[in-house]
Amino acid sequence: MMERATTIWLASYPKSGNTWLRAMYSAWSSQEQARLDRLQGLPMAASRQAFDDALGIDSADLTADEIDLLRPRADEVIAAQDRRDGEIRLRKVHDALFTGPAGEPVVSVSAARCAIYVIRDPRDVAVSLAHHTDRSMDYVVDYMASHVAALGAAADWLEPQVRQRLGTWSEHVESWTEQDVIPPLVVRYEDCLRDPVAVWSAVLDFAGLGVEPDRVSQAVAASSFTRLQEQEKREGFNERTSPSGLFFRQGRSGGWRTSLPAELAAKLESDHQAVMQRFGYLEGDG
């Protein structure tokens, strides 16, 4: 039997719960309380440093398209080292699963053990993303409908992450959930809030990592949203971008009802109706 690949792609649109699941993985693998500083050991797919180190080149000398062309090769170098070390690595991905200049996905297919796609009600995403980026909600709602939306795409300075093309929120969801090159398990953020033990057990089972009920329960307790929020307040978190707010801000569903203006909620529902309906976000008003 062929040995399974070592990279689990943990994919999501920004502010959809990706980091919370990374914390669960950290707590599960270490069998200790989740530590935010340990998440740096789970480098995201768009890490410029990881890309440069893997290929031994300086990405500052490359265009964004040239980097996209080489990113799968960098993933394969990292995966090969993980295979030698006997390690299975969870890697955060915010890119939509678009194809790059050579016609292949921007992350490596051959390195992939599987994909976990985390989806969240886009109305809650909009509120969370506005706080995270210090942008207006009007701006964020328009951004979520932009076909050219991207992270790390600044032209006048070098960011620690390489460009990540997002597309619209709907395009992002469909790019991961309507493909079969990297088998995906779709996890709703709301279900994770409701029953994190069941969701994390399903993730482990899907990834072929084995489900030990006591270990799962301990990992979930050790990475609770409250604990992560308290830790961030005490020690900070390097993934926080807004100086005025926490990365782990509220961690609940349905907050859009009191935070998002009605006309913006209606625009999101119109822009993303088909995908929202498919994943149950328009049934009973989310």
Predicted regions: what they are:
Residues 1-187, 242, 249-254, 258-286:
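PAPS-dependent sulfotransferase catalytic domain
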Residues 123-126, 197-201, 213-217, 265, ...:
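An amphipathic alpha-helix signature
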Residues 82, 211-212:
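Short, surface-exposed helix-loop/turn micro-motifs enriched in polar/charged residues
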Residues 221-244:
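Short acidic/His-enriched helical or mixed secondary-structure segments at domain edges of catalytic enzymes
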Residues 214-221, 280-286:
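Short, flexible loop/turn segments with low-complexity composition
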Residues 17-31, 186-211, 219, 227:
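PAPS/PAP-binding and catalytic site of the sulfotransferase fold
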